[in-house]
């Protein structure tokens, strides 16, 4: 038997030829420079185009610390020693409270539609949002939050 002449190999070659005719060859014009999308392929009805969808950015949000609290901390005596479990439970409670306050703030400022995802509360009062740039602008103006963007991995 010749190599490449097995029945399953012939069927595979025939399928590959049929798919290349159906989807176009690599030399076809690509949509938006994206490989694998042919200019002959139409978007689904009702699909939002790239011009109508906001550019999503990754944002880190934390509660803003008051300067007076930092100066009081230097002069105050050392806090009592707590177990790691107590510190962890206190962090979970503080993070959950911060998550609720951020969600209430987003709802009050009518920004929930511009937020794609919000991370779950953890053991630190810090959340990650995937949102439109206007949400970051509003968060930076708010006196109760400290917000900034994350560097994309492709720039590292």
UniProtKB/Swiss-Prot annotation:
One Gene Ontology CC term in the entry: cytoplasm
Activity control, per UniProt: In response to starvation, RelA is activated resulting in the accumulation of (p)ppGpp, which causes the degradation of PopD in an FtsH(D)-dependent manner, thereby releasing pre-formed PopC for secretion.
Main subcellular localisation: cytoplasm
Biased composition (Basic and acidic residues): 8-28
Localization, UniProt: Cytoplasm
Disruption phenotype: Deletion mutant has a severe growth defect, forms tan colonies and fails to develop. Mutant shows increased accumulation of PopC in the supernatant.
Keyword Cytoplasm: yes
Intrachain S-S bonds: none
Keywords: Cytoplasm
The keyword Cytoplasm appears for this protein: yes
Source organism superkingdom: Bacteria
Physiological role: Inhibitor of protease PopC. In non-starving cells, forms a cytoplasmic complex with PopC and inhibits PopC secretion and activity.
Quaternary structure, from the entry: Interacts with PopC in non-starving cells.
Name used for this protein in its record: PopC secretion inhibitor
Provenance organism: Myxococcus xanthus (strain DK1622)
Gene that specifies this protein: popD
């Amino acid at each position: 038997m010749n190599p490449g002449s097995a029945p399953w190999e012939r069927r595979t070659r025939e399928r590959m030829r049929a798919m290349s005719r159906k989807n176009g060859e690599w030399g076809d014009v690509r949509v938006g420079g994206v490989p694998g999308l042919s200019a002959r392929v139409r978007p689904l009805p009702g699909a939002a185009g790239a011009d109508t969808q906001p550019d999503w950015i990754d944002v880190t949000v934390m509660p803003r610390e008051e300067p007076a609290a930092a100066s009081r901390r230097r002069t105050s005596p050392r806090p009592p020693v707590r177990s790691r479990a107590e510190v962890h439970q206190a962090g979970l409670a503080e993070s959950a409270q911060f998550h609720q306050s951020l969600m209430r703030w987003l709802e009050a400022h009518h920004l929930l539609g511009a937020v794609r995802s919000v991370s779950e509360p953890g053991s630190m009062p810090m959340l990650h949002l995937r949102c439109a740039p206007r949400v970051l602008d509003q968060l930076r103006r708010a006196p109760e939050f400290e917000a900034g963007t994350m560097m994309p991995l492709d720039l590292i």
